[in-house]
Amino acid sequence: MSGMTRRLRRRGSWSAAPFAVALLISALLPAGAAAQEEASSSSSSASSSSDRLLEAARDGAVEVVRALVADGADGADVNAARGDGMTALHFAAERGHAAVARVLIDAGAAVDAGTRIGRYAPLHLAARGGHGPVVALLLEAGADPNAATTNSGVTALHLAAAAAVDGRSAVAALLDHGADPNAREGSAGQTPLMFAAAANRPAAAAALLEAGADPGTPTAVVDVLPSLALDREANRRMRDMIGAPRETLGPYGPEVDSEAEWPGEPTPAHVQAAIRAQREFLRSGFDVGEVSAHSLGRTGPDYPGGPDLIRPPYREVLVGRTGGMTALLHAAREGHIEAATALLDGGANIDQASADATTPLLMAALNGQFDLALALIERGADPDLAASTDGATPLFAVLQTQWAPKSNYPQPRAQDLQDAGHMDVLRALLDAGADPNPRLNTHLWYWEYGLTKMGIDLTGATPFWRAAFAQDIEAMKLLVAHGADPNIPTRWPEVGMRERRQQDGRQQEDSALPWIPEGAPNAWPIHAAAGGGYLGLGAFSVRNRPDQFIPAVKYLIEELGADVDQRDSWLYTPMHYAASRGDNELIEYLVSQGGDVTAITRLGQSTADMARGGRAGFFTRVPFPETVDLLTSLGATLECLHTHFLDTGDSCPGAGIDDPWAPAATSQEGKR
């Protein structure tokens, strides 16, 4: 007999063994053990029935459910749950199977059973799906209409208010059974009315308002600087705890072994305990005291060897405050005209602003919701109310949104989906009496979606300046027709609140020239129109009308009297900006209007230098040889190839000569 045959026979000889062993064990087992095995088999059968019950409830198979719960001692456990805590009643509620839910409730299903995470009851799931009949059934069976989930703190009414299908019937059932129309969820204090507004559920919003929902309730307000101070303190404490002897963490969890020797690296349990302690600290209401931009600033040089500066937390200072969002602000952000109309008809204040004084009209403009912006203007929204931080008004916001810089990643473009164009909104705002000349208080934190490529600072910019930066000549003319001043420049903020990247492409201001004073004029509209912002990486981010450089500059010079040789704060002229883009046609036009091709910048570069392709910090400009030839033929000199950038050796001999920001010749005060 071969080995293979022996193996096959051996394998075959064992094939009947389980049956023989089972018979033998059955014969030898005492009566009690046999009964125990029978009970185990019965338990397995019940477990199987419970699994089938969960599936049948999910699928809406009411007859199967009825049969399974009617099997007496052998029937399914009506409250059996999966590992996530979902019972048959949860599934029936989630899918809207009212008949199944009735059978389960009659069989003793617990109406307030909660899931493992969040303790979502069947009522929450039915409300989220907008299943009004199931919601009513659960409430009649004793479900708590105000029970909140433990993770987000939402009630069933929050979820019903946002439901896409038949949400109003679910909302009505909940309100009829005592649900609080002004309940707040746990993260930001949002109400059911805010959920309805954000999801554009006008019928649900109307029902909530009729039941006493307050349209003026705001979300929680966060003062960003104190919040930053608290976060820093929490992080400091956590780092100290992780770096401390392990036994000091004993009170934060029994898993911490206070007897073990300190190994030099924290264990996962050690880190987890520190994180838990940090969370407890953040919830403790710790008072950080008085804080300011300067007290939270970092002191040090921007570059090796540079002067010490106090750098306040830049974006946090610009943001200032968050929250204070009403239901109408939620609708405005999403552009939901129907929900906004329901809210206004129900008594919402059309001008109630958020924590940073953003009104619904400004919110709509900032988010490209131009159709809703027009509707708000028609209903009497104030066109001049500005944000309290940056001072942006709806007029500026419309232009900023329309011509928002390009980004490395996709950004919302709701304005592309509107029936109204940006000119329609600008015209409506101006016709409603909007001031055409408000200036920004600060730079906009959302200017480049959090990036800083251009080095442009918008402090002091007007709507006209913003239109000029985009070469939006139609908007420029409309603004002037309504009284816009075309000669208002941007201005410099305090030194510590300036972008590190400079508008000529340098990574930081390291020219060693005196600081330009706070409040000093920076760039005029003619610089913006001629190509200001194109000297560095910003050239790849600008969104504008590239075919309108010359018409925009001509309009400024010929119709508005702009100075063809206007110097900005770094002594660039419109000619410099045209040269940096290789725009020979604009150069020739500027020369025809008396433009000076021999002008030298504060950093010591000529107009021709701007077209030579030299370095500006880590950025190398595109060379335009034909532009260099044109300018030199017109009298421009070649002074310095690379932009003055002291620490790299790219220093221009003419930098700082005739510097308007230099102290008196006999004093070196202010030199760096």
Report the location of each language-model feature.
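Ankyrin repeat A-helix N-terminal signature
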Residues: E55-G60, F91-H97, L125-H131, L159-G167, ...
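Bacterial N-terminal signal peptides
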Residues: A17-L28
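N-terminal segments that cap or nucleate solenoid repeat domains
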Residues: E37-A39, A46-F91, A327, A331, ...
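Start-of-repeat signature of ankyrin repeats
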Residues: S49, G85, G118-R119, S152-G153, ...
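Ankyrin repeat domain, specifically the short helix-to-loop turn at the C-terminus of the second helix
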Residues: V69-A76, R102-A110, A136-D144, A172-D180, ...
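Acidic/polar low-complexity surface segments
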Residues: G153, T219-R236, G253, E261-V271, ...
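Ankyrin repeat boundary signal
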Residues: V78-A81, V111-T115, P145-T149, P181-E185, ...
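Conserved ankyrin/ankyrin-like repeat signature
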Residues: V64, A99-V100, P133-V134, S169-A170, ...
